[in-house]
Amino acid sequence: MRRLRRLVHLVLLCPFSKGLQGRLPGLRVKYVLLVWLGIFVGSWMVYVHYSSYSELCRGHVCQVVICDQYQKGIISGSVCQDLCELQKVEWRTCLSSAPGQQVYSGLWQDKEVTIKCGIEEALNSKAWPDAVPRRELVLFDKPTRGTSIKEFREMTLSFLKANLGDLPSLPALVDQILLMADFNKDSRVSLAEAKSVWALLQRNEFLLLLSLQEKEHASRLLGYCGDLYLTESIPHGSWHGAVLLPALRPLLPSVLHRALQQWFGPAWPWRAKIAIGLLEFVEELFHGSYGTFYMCETTLANVGYTATYDFKMADLQQVAPEATVRRFLQGRHCEQSSDCIYGRDCRAPCDKLMRQCKGDLIQPNLAKVCELLRDYLLPGAPADLYEELGKQLRTCTTLSGLASQVEAHHSLVLSHLKTLLWREISNTNYS
């Protein structure tokens, strides 16, 4: 007990000499209060972190909900047996940034995977005591029993037209969806298979994964069970994903984000290679087989890359089809342009006479990406390249006008940027 008292005395009073303590007894009390205040603040931060973590990371809830519906025969999929019966899907690190969209790293069939599952309804257990039944009724309500395969095909085609636009390539995409639904290859689509695929199509990212499956820079879809799905893992996600826990990411200012990126990010030539991949991804989104797509949250959080520094889009949640963005914005009431926003940064002009948003976006994908690349590429750039690179990125960020009307200029600027970066790294080991 005496040793404990001595230790406390040393910790709390050591900074002051005995003479100073005698002359200034008030300082002793202030110092003790300061120490206890530090302990309180630290404890509060730990509590907030873990309460946020428990809210963000609820993969166990997701698995319980999905497996409950699988065992009832409501849903099916290529991963269901391994997930719910054989326990061969291993959940590892929580990567979620929002409670309603659960994201985990994992292992399946000896492959590193990313597990994604939405649990919006299941999280509302206080407001909805019957959360699981409500989820199956709302999310897995279509198609209904008795729907023919022809009706399901037409239903799927109509859904794709509404979300991607009326494109000649859509019937081929419907065939691909029906082929995926028949995961057990018995040449028929059961009601459970149809319900699962229909629920998956309601997930924006899943629809994007299907549309961009042939593209080099989107993650490959590996399997699903109900509306839970697995994609190939991106070995190196965004820089702050590796450095920070999800609950702390929104708390840091952008200046500190950039500083951390410099400290923990790859060397400049590797960053140049990743940037080239990001520019190629912008090309892939522009007038592809299934229309044009807009990036509506352009941040370093979405910049992922493989072990060989090839760019992979880490998150497609904020990439939206042109038809979806137009439908949301066109005719929407507005007083100013700031009222016409889809996602975080897809902005349309406001017709102040009609007080309605227009459907065309003001800033194209490339301008937003170049703004991002200024912070990503200019720090640490070779001295002989710095001025020209800065000039081209400034030109690129000033691309304006309606996103649908800048095609020629867009392509020219993008080509110049890619050429400049490739020229710098093409004759080195970094290429």
From Swiss-Prot:
Positions occupied by motif May mediate ER retention: 5-6
Topological domain ranges for the Lumenal compartment: 52-431
Cytoplasmic side: 1-30
Coiled coil: none
Pfam families the UniProt entry points to: PIP49_C, PIP49_N
Membrane topology term: Single-pass type II membrane protein
Subcellular location: Endoplasmic reticulum membrane
S-S pairs: 57-94, 62-117
Keywords: Disulfide bond, Endoplasmic reticulum, Membrane, Signal-anchor, Transmembrane, Transmembrane helix
Main location group: endoplasmic reticulum
Record keyword Zinc present: no
Organism domain of life: Eukaryota
Annotated transmembrane regions: 31-51
Post-translational modification: Among the many cysteines in the lumenal domain, most are probably involved in disulfide bonds.
Gene Ontology cellular component annotations, sorted alphabetically: endoplasmic reticulum membrane
Record-stated family: Belongs to the DIPK family.
Name of this protein: Divergent protein kinase domain 1B
Protein species of origin: Rattus norvegicus (Rat)
Taxonomic lineage of the native organism: Eukaryota, Metazoa, Chordata, Craniata, Vertebrata
